[in-house]
Amino acid sequence: KKNTKKDFPQDSHEQLWGAISAVFQSWQNQRAKTYRRLNNIPEEWGTAVNIQSMVFGNMGNDCATGVAFTRNPSTGENSFYGEYLINAQGEDVVAGIRTPRNITKKERLESSSEDLSLEETMPEAFAELTKIYKKLETHYRDMQDIEFTIENKKLWMLQTRSGKRTAKASIKIAVDMVSEKLITKDEALLRIDPKILDTLLHPTLDPKAKKNIIAKGLPASPGAATGKVTFNADDAEQMKANNQNTILVRVETSPEDIHGMHAAVGILTCRGGMTSHAAVVARGMGRPCVSGAGVIKIDYAAKLFKVDNAEVKEGDIITIDGSTGEVMLGEVKTINPDISGDFSEMMKWADEVRTLKIRANAETPLDSRTARGFGAEGIGLCRTEHMFFDEERILYVRQMILSKTKEDRLKALDKILPFQRKDFVEIFTIMKGLPVTVRLLDPPLHEFLPKTEKEIDIVAKSLKIHSSEIKNRINYLHEENPMLGHRGCRLAISFPEIYEMQCRAIFEALYELQKQKVEAVIPEIMIPLVATEREIEILRELVDRIAQEIQKKNNFKVDYLVGTMIELPRAALNANNIAKHADFFSFGTNDLTQTTLGISRDDSGKFLDDYVENKIFKIDPFVSIDQDGVGELIKLACSRGLEAKKNIKLGICGEHGGDPDSIDFCHRAGLHYVSCSPYRVPIARLSAAQASIRAKK
């Protein structure tokens, strides 16, 4: 009455239609919109309403209600798993109002609980439930999430559905079901959401690290997380926007907290079980979660929680381990995961099916090792400018930029050459036998110059010049729109000696490896920001000239490719002419998206959400390829490039290279490889396999 200004209806039909209407209206509430956005669910789908007669689990001690999974949703273990409450209604189990009991005796003993399991208190109902869950899983050929009620000792099944599970459990269940001949390998591959693999590829707590454990709850969602304590979902979202990791601490979570749960790196609740809202949502999101930590007493008004004599305030750092249920004060050291077993088996199946090659974007030895460890088949983007920012070499780079004559520039470049050569030797050694795409210098020169007065004075003193010279050079190099300014191949047209030095470093590194009898890589030298045929023609001649010079001088031969990034619409439209001088195209989808849509990636955050909400874009085009615009240019460039050169190699190296939907597009567009960040390589491998399977259907 307070909300509707009407008395509660007494007519049962009016009540029923009111409930049905409420479900339909819930599709447009804020938490539903957030959930759709996070899970890429189309708004036009709508929601269904199920109507069924009621049974009661709260009529006495011979009644109960529960939630069960046909396999463990956290580990994937093939054992019946769940929770129940005596004399309670269904929502009580998941709402976290009371801490529920285990369903099986085995679970109870493992958790050291004194509360008897369903198997012990109601053995007949448990036996019937066991038969039914096995039948349901065999029928649906997937792990089931079951809700049931026991009314006066009689078992009623309320619903069954495919259960949410952790990434680890998803893979184990899929691999086990193939072994059990319930599903095929292709079905197993299609069942894994590639994005959830992220949760398997990040650190866990170092078992040797010192831990100040202040509480222990239920291990609701695996993984470890460290962050600042916050008690409010909105604050968690704001802190994430400020690049702060947070642990969202709540008595219990509800659907209103979903945006904060997504923003937080971990979730801690003091009420609720393994099937509570916090546990289920955290598992689905891949967030570590500890639930049911009853010793924690939260004071929302004072913005703190107490455990015995300890007091933890908002902003204090804690660590949670969702695999053990431990809550610790401060930051605890982590270790990288060991990827093997079921994960390796699944990746092996994916590699057998996919046709797209998977490379990584890497420019340091550490990145290269990580990429190779995750199964990368080469480097699709090695950004050479990142090598310039090292403390040892940035001074020489600045000296080169500040030089007034070509002679002075060459002297500075001679000092940079050994550093670049050393970097390439390391990377080529790690990636031996695989292709490595080296992008020659791309950013505008002003990015390498000092920014503050203090930095300017330090550089001036080091180079023995007046600070005014540096300021004058900074002013001269300043650009209103540097993304479209004097960068990429345009720099090399003005200052060819920069690309000459980089090419020398590449070919001298190859000679070093040949002397050491290291298996050769095939370098793919990539020229960025090409818009015209003449640009690539001039710079191809430069690369070939340096290659011949180094090979002749050292009496050795090496295979190499020269290609370009397609990141401007004009380049895509003129791909047939550009292909005459290129061995490969690599689509730089970050800049191609910016230049096609006329949208700055750095500034788009202010309005892109409005565009998605108003259905102008289905999804952020910097996250997933805009297939109707950017995608059409890519397909056109591929077609025209192949017309001019049948064996031209085609790939992408933008951020989209790790996005499953973009990878599916790349497969359909006929690209040969995608390149992504090292930690997204397994995601790309699985996504490419799924694209291949879908294409066969």
Regions found by a protein language model. Give the residues of each.
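Extended, highly charged
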Residues: 1-75, 87, 98-104, 108-132, ...
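Extended active-site and interfacial segments that coordinate phosphate-rich ligands
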Residues: 59-123, 160-188, 263-298, 310, ...
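Flexible, glycine/threonine-enriched loop-and-boundary segments that flank and lead into catalytic domains
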Residues: 31-68, 233-235, 242, 247, ...
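Hydrophobic alpha-helical scaffolding
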Residues: 6-13, 40-41, 57, 75, ...
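Acidic, glycine-rich flexible loop/linker segments
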Residues: 199, 204, 212, 220-236, ...
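Conserved alpha/beta-domain cores
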Residues: 339-341, 349-697
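Conserved catalytic alpha/beta cores of large enzymes that bind or transform nucleotide phosphates
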Residues: 1, 79-160, 166, 172-208, ...
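Generic beta-strand/beta-sheet core signal
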Residues: 51-54, 65, 70-71, 79-87, ...
